[in-house]
Amino acid sequence: MRPDGTRVRDLTAIMQALPYVMPKRYDAQNWAEEYLDEDAIRDYIRAKRREGRTVTHMSLLVSAYYRAVLKNPKINYFVMNRRIYKRNHFCFSFVILKTRADGTPDETSLKVYLEPDDTVFTVTEKIRSTIEKNQNVRHNNDTDRFAKFAFGVPGLARAVFGLAGFLDRHDLLPRSIIELSPFHTSQIGRASCRERV
């Protein structure tokens, strides 16, 4: 059993066949373009800020998507090795830009886990505290340390990531590695540099 999900067995024959018909990620990838009323979003954010409550665009969109996942859990399914799994949590990854001690820019990936009772305000706080903790110049999160280790020795990255891929395909990848990976997630987003948290 995978640490990040359980196999879905009560699928129709068509659903079970889809990973075979579309075996590559790009075969089944869905892209959607949605236009939102930005004025309504800005008005909501301003109204909440006047009340003394901080809300960001990112936290608002993540919260809305999470509510959709709670109403339709199949959105949070994933495919590994042509088998369909139900993710046993909701998390989202995003990348932030931070500055190194020498002043050069660097980026790091972050992962935030949500609970069913989270609101737009608790999501905002979780994002803010995660960014704040990881913007420290001297702070490297576990993902940064793992990447530095993997790329520290020539040829090691290929072996490390090859082994991780093998373990993942056979449902043996440890939870600790899944928690490090920004790609084992329900949603990947990006934080705008103009957005104030």
Residue ranges and their predicted role:
Residues 1-197:
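C-terminal catalytic/motor cores of large multi-domain enzyme assemblies
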